[in-house]
Amino acid sequence: MANLSIRMYSNCLRRTVSFQVIMPNDPRADVPPMEEKYARRGMKTLFLLHGYTGDSWNWVPEELAAKYNFAIVVPSGENAFWIDGLSTGHEFGKFLGVELVEYMRKTFGLAKTKEDTYVMGFSMGGFGALHTALAYPDTFGTSAAWSSALIVHEVAKMTPGYDNGVANYDYYRECFGEPSKVLESDNNPETLVKKLKAAGKELPEIIMACGTEDFLIERNREMHRFLEEQDVAHEYWEDAGIHDMVFWGKCVQKYVPVMFG
């Protein structure tokens, strides 16, 4: 298993950034070989997104990547919700959806088709996984979103001086744009769904999951109902769990074989 730490200059973020790449390209003699059907089809690529306060660390077991023959790309989205902010150097959505994908294509020959390109995340990264696949449906074929921080309806109600203890009004405005306009903007996954449907475009495969004791469960249920109302095919799963790696680990073990098997 190759573990690479890469530094590159990002024009979207106007600085040098670091990210991790895990590639199952060095089979070991002391473990069973990869099944021929996975080796023969070529390596797929999973872009893996962290949550609020997180960074570029891999949280998908490497043995799954080795078994199903997929590379894992783990960038850092800081606390920017994986979308394009207002300030110069804050195009985190374009960095992930365009710049980083193109870098992986030209450097490693990976992620060449949407069928071979996946995005997965939890919490803020779950929002990012869903939003990114909908914003770049010709690039990402599958989105897996765990315990997603689908907070745009809350952001829409924020006014100057707002502070919920996690972040203040200025932070949310920087990430999402003017709160009063966020519901109609492309930073709202619901808006992206409606636009794709109106244009007759194929939507990515969507997989969502949330723990029944998670503080974000109602937000995820609302998105599930919205997708049902829009007749958007998707997988939605609930199980006992809170907002933690125990539940997200269950999601990975349950759905990675479905996604890559």
What are these regions (language model features)?
Residues 1-261:
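Non-catalytic cap/lid and distal C-terminal segments of serine-dependent acyl enzymes
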